[in-house]
Curated annotation (Swiss-Prot):
GO terms for cellular component: cytoplasm. GO terms for molecular function: phosphate:acyl-[acyl carrier protein] acyltransferase activity. The gene is plsX. GO terms for biological process: fatty acid biosynthetic process; phospholipid biosynthetic process. This is Phosphate acyltransferase. Belongs to the PlsX family. Catalyzes the reversible formation of acyl-phosphate (acyl-PO(4)) from acyl-[acyl-carrier-protein] (acyl-ACP). This enzyme utilizes acyl-ACP as fatty acyl donor, but not acyl-CoA. Pathway: Lipid metabolism; phospholipid metabolism. SUPFAM superfamilies: Isocitrate/Isopropylmalate dehydrogenase-like (SSF53659).
Length: 331
């Protein structure tokens, strides 16, 4: 049986290298029958962390890293960086997918320049999984890759995200993020996307307001990169603020009894909205399976992102996306 090959960029993020190497080892041993993980980075730093397992992991050596403060322009001077090398390996079909925690803007630009877009696609999109109150997720895209979009772009985002959502839900509900649910609301590209989606065979429910995202009114929610990014960061910020507020209140002597009683509920809420369980965001629209995790990712987040990447490759999602796009565009 041919093994799934994953490229793992080990450089350019804010946390210790131990997190990514431990995640690589543990995830490999969970799937060693059909998985190979190719580590891209500084071999002198990676090998000691692998201990006796170093023979199990091919290493693409480089000492050049794209840093979080690099720009697209400065990154061009680092053609031998771990990110560039991994992308070239993916383009040359030496692997099935790639995971990085590196610089987001540089990653999207270089992935676009190296791998290219799928047929029918004009813009890429970042798609994270947003945890919802019922324990599920909403596929939210775009959250920052493409700010200047039209209705066709949103329509294409919906097709691609719908393909991935079908891995979890047989008939995913699709919506467009807007300031109201009425058909006349929004900008021209909202109206254009609305009309295109209405005439498609997707399970389209219409416009969706930001206040219902966490209630999983839809399984796929499409937006321009500016609005989607604001929505995502607002949810993350509110979650952290409420969590910190409750922690501070529970520390007060007068609230100790209430804290003990509500601790199980608090843990349940925290688990429901834990982004670490869904720490990988797809870069959709490119001719490859690419996942980006947080620049400050820890062991758990790398494990989560590897799981997302592995399952997507195993389900042959890239070819399914191509089929769905061709079906809509009559090829």
């Amino acid at each position: 049986m041919e093994k799934i090959k994953i490229l793992l960029d080990t450089m350019g993020y804010e946390n210790d290298l131990e997190h990514v190497i431990k995640a690589a080892k543990d995830f490999y041993y969970q799937h060693e029958d059909d998985l190979e993980i190719i580590l891209v980075g500084n071999e002198q730093l990676i090998k000691p962390l692998l201990d006796n397992d170093w023979r199990l992991f091919p290493i693409v050596h480089t000492e050049v890293s794209i840093e979080q403060n690099d720009t697209i322009l400065s990154a061009r001077k680092k053609q031998n960086s771990s990110m560039h090398l991994a992308l070239r390996y993916l383009k040359d079909k030496q692997a099935d997918g790639m995971l990085t925690a590196g610089n987001s803007a540089v990653f999207v630009y270089n992935a676009y320049a190296t791998i290219g877009l799928l047929e029918h696609i004009k813009k890429p999109a970042f798609m994270p999984f947003v945890p919802t109150i019922d324990g599920g997720v909403t596929n939210l895209l775009d959250v920052g890759a493409s700010i200047d979009v039209d209705g066709t772009d949103l329509f294409n985002f919906a097709i691609m995200a719908n393909t991935i959502a079908k891995m979890r839900t047989p008939n995913p509900r699709v919506g467009v993020l807007n300031i109201g649910t009425e058909d006349h609301k929004g900008l021209p590209y909202h109206q254009e996307a609305n009309e295109l989606l209405k005439t498609s065979n997707l399970n389209y429910v219409g416009f969706v307001e930001p206040k219902t995202i966490l209630e999983r009114e839809v399984d796929v929610l499409v937006a321009d990169g500016f609005s989607g990014n604001i929505a995502l960061k607002t949810m993350e910020g509110v979650g952290k603020t409420i969590s910190n507020f409750l922690k501070n209140e529970y520390k007060k002597p007068k609230n100790l009894f209430a804290a003990l009683l509500s601790k199980p509920i608090f843990k349940k809420i925290k688990k429901a909205f834990d982004y670490k369980e869904h720490a990988g965001a797809f870069v959709l629209g490119l001719d490859g399976i690419l996942v980006k995790t947080h620049g400050s990712a820890d062991y758990q987040q790398f494990m989560s992102a590897l799981k997302i990447l592995y399952e997507t490759i195993k389900a042959d999602v890239l070819n399914e996306i191509k089929k769905d796009l061709n079906n809509y565009y009559g090829q």
